[in-house]
Amino acid sequence: MDKEKLFAQIKGGLIVSCQALETEPLYTKEGGVMPLMAKAAAMSGAVGIRANTVRDITQIKQVVDLPVIGIIKKDYPGTPMYITVTMKEVDELVACGVDILAVQGTGALRPDGSTSAQFIRAIKAKYPDQLVMADCDNFENAMACAEAGADFVGTTMRGYTPETQGINDIDFEFVHKLATECPAKVIAEGHIHYPEQAVKALEAGAFALVVGGAITRPAEITARFTGAINAAKK
């Protein structure tokens, strides 16, 4: 898809994350479940899909005509990085035709000792036309990734790193600061549980937003309800 056309398509819209890890109820070895989630999202007005693994991305692209943010989650020894960590995953994602390639953009080092900024520069050198999103946790890392060539920075990892531990809600001030000062387009992602929060994130300056657990993870949604009910009984 043409870059400017993609920007126009997702601006101000909802991208739905359709993922199921092996430990989750909706995971199957054969796949086929996440494409159904993606179809439901597309029917309801989603402007894009975020997906994990080449299999799910390929299956999703067969059933919906929406831009896909692609990632590969994989743990590596010696690093907390797990979202598109090495060039091997990058090569696989580019080969399956992801519209936006997302990588972890936090402060930890990759297995080869490279920083997030160095990794993004390497991706852009190898695939200069590939749109890249950095999943960040704080302002400094987001700026470093943007300056390295990331087209998008996401708030994806805020609250999930040692430096941001304890942040359990969408940080609208952080979104606004990035939208005001960062040269990359800002995608609000993480801790968005309600439609009102999504609207507020866009009002804070987000270019677009990603919502996953509140839409496509039934176990998480159920736990939110049962947790509230059980708390009220005490």
Residue ranges and their predicted role:
Residues 64-72, 120, 127-128, 202-213:
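Short, electropositive alpha-helical surface patch
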